Amino acid sequence: MESSKKLQTYHTASIFAIDRLRMGTDGHGITTLVCLMGCPLRCAYCLNDRCHEEIYSKGSRGLYLNKGIIQLDANELYDHVKIDDLYFQATGGGICFGGGEPTRYASFIEEFRRVCGNVWKITLETSLYCSEDTIRQLAPIVDHWIVDVKDINHVI
């Protein structure tokens, strides 16, 4: 799994949490949950309100990432999570992208799949509030979909 050669990547993800060694909640085996910023929905009972916060603040010298938010490219995320490679391989686990709405980061997730290879499972915990084109883009690389249908009442 370990490779000294980095793949060229072009996309970054804004992340507010990386939660390691999860079992039984975010897909098969042991997983790491990567919580992404941003969601087009504003559900009254959202479990991850943090995803709606501003990513940047304006300062005297430009824009700054707000406290607790990191931006990583696919290689950098891999470097953060590869410590659990043995757990992922032994249990059939891998990475679960959630947070916010992971389909907003489709190109980043594609790049992450290229970086991590096909041994780890990739799970999306999603509302599927995205275009059909995005689903078609992600379908070949996502192993498991956790579709979170909170309520079909348009008022909520």
Tell where the protein language model's regions lie, with residue ranges:
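Conserved, mostly hydrophobic/aromatic
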Residues: 34, 43, 101, 124, ...
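Auxiliary Fe-S-binding modules of radical SAM enzymes
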Residues: 1-26, 79
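Conserved Radical SAM active-site core
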Residues: 30, 48-141
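Short glycine-rich anion-binding loops that position phosphate/pyrophosphate groups of nucleotides
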Residues: 39, 102, 151-152
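Feature marks short, surface-exposed loop/turn motifs that line or immediately flank catalytic pockets
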Residues: 130, 153-155
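Electropositive phosphate-/nucleotide-binding environments in soluble metabolic enzymes
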Residues: 9, 33, 37, 71
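N-terminal pre-triad scaffold of radical SAM enzymes
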Residues: 14-52, 56
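Non-cysteine beta-strand/loop elements that form the S-adenosyl-L-methionine
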Residues: 139-153
